[in-house]
Amino acid sequence: MPKDASGPPRSLLVLGGTSAIGLATARRLIARGARLVHLAARPSPALEKAAGELTALGAEVRTVPFDALDPESHQASLGPVFAAGDVDLVLLRFGIAGDQARDESRPLDAVRVAQTNYTGAVGAGLLCGAALQEQGHGTLVVLSSAAGVRARRADFIYGSSKAGLDAFAQGLGDALYGTGVRVMVVRPGTVLDPGTPRGDARLTTTPGQVAAAIELGLRRGSETVWVPGGLRLVMSAVRGLPRPLFRRLVV
């Protein structure tokens, strides 16, 4: 795959290759000219189905066995992807929401949320950042969450894992500044599945809307993307609330 340091990405690696946001983004980028897609996830029928759907859109799709919870395997899984040719875009999308009520009483389940969303992402993010720097160009898109801006009582386990991921991604972006590699942090609100009641439009979004925002952010060269855009102002206000008031606020 030839180097394409500017313009729409022609080759991409999706970490979380069965995620709705990852696949929606891949579909949009294929429509804009992407020709090679690596889908990285645990082997499953869902992964093969996703690969088939993207292949039908005209892309060459390669599946990559990847387990976020096994960082010692990341080099063996992802190294060959970069060795095979330049990757213009890496989308780091894997993660789990967990179940707050259950996880509070089952600490090992809470640890699994943290390990998947944060430590797994640290290992994969550093590996991909170094590989992009080695090739001299590329963009790493990291899916954070508005939940990481200020963890709520209702989801502080998940929120704290995303807070760590967000801080890591920002720091990695600073570390890679000037190398030809860019890190873009995406902070969606609550992502709704098809058929789910929408609720407050300032706080919710869909996989398709997140994908569209990612595409726009890539074109603009953005470092941070909020989805929906108005969420930035909402969360800025939430961040500054005194704790006694924040405890009573349902957001």
Swiss-Prot record:
Belongs to the short-chain dehydrogenases/reductases (SDR) family. May be involved in the biosynthesis of a heptaene-type antibiotic. It holds the Pfam family adh_short. GO terms for biological process: antibiotic biosynthetic process. It is an enzyme of class 1 (oxidoreductase). Keywords: Antibiotic biosynthesis, Oxidoreductase. Substrate binds at S145. GO terms for molecular function: oxidoreductase activity. Gene3D superfamilies: NAD(P)-binding Rossmann-like Domain. NADP(+) binds at residues 14-37. This is Uncharacterized oxidoreductase in mprA 5'region. Its EC number is 1.-.-.-. It comes from Streptomyces coelicolor. The active site is at Y158 (proton acceptor).
